[in-house]
């Protein structure tokens, strides 16, 4: 079927590299199983959503390398990478993946801190008198 599809996904500071190849459903995330790295069922369901659209989740092996950011950022970055890898394999899935929002990269980033302020938008306490 396929040799191997490699794709990258990003969200905030999280970067995920996903390798998709035909196999028997083995998923490796930074040397751990998917259940060990992402313990919550909601996170695992979010990540595997693009594969579920293909049909058989157990007919592919995934090797995922993820770094940076928080857990939820890593989940969304991995989902984007997986959707892009699926798209390389089945280009006719583009409309369905796009309709679900799996191919959309969330552009929101942390706003920089400004001088004269405590944080990006929070000011120092103001005393009228």
Swiss-Prot record:
Stored Pfam families: Ribosomal_S9
Biased composition (Basic residues): 110-129
GO terms (BP aspect): translation
GO function terms (MF aspect): RNA binding; structural constituent of ribosome
A cellular-component GO term for this protein: cytosolic small ribosomal subunit
Keywords from the named record: Ribonucleoprotein, Ribosomal protein
Region (Disordered): 97-129
Xref: HAMAP family: Ribosomal_uS9_B
Similarity comment text for this entry: Belongs to the universal ribosomal protein uS9 family.
Entry protein name: Small ribosomal subunit protein uS9
Species for this entry: Chlamydia trachomatis serovar D (strain ATCC VR-885 / DSM 19411 / UW-3/Cx)
């Amino acid at each position: 079927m396929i040799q191997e599809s490699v794709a990258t996904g990003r969200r905030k500071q999280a970067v995920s590299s996903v390798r998709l190849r035909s196999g028997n459903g083995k998923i490796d995330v930074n040397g751990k199983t998917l259940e060990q790295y992402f313990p919550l069922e909601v996170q695992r369901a979010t990540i595997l959503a693009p594969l579920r659209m293909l049909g058989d989740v157990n007919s592919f092996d995934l090797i995922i390398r993820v770094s940076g950011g928080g857990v939820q950022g890593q989940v969304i970055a991995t989902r984007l990478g997986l959707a892009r890898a699926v798209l390389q394999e089945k280009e006719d899935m583009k409309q369905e993946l796009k309709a679900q929002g799996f191919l959309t990269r969330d552009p929101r980033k942390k706003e920089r801190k400004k001088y004269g302020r405590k944080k990006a938008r929070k000011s120092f306490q103001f005393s009228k008198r």
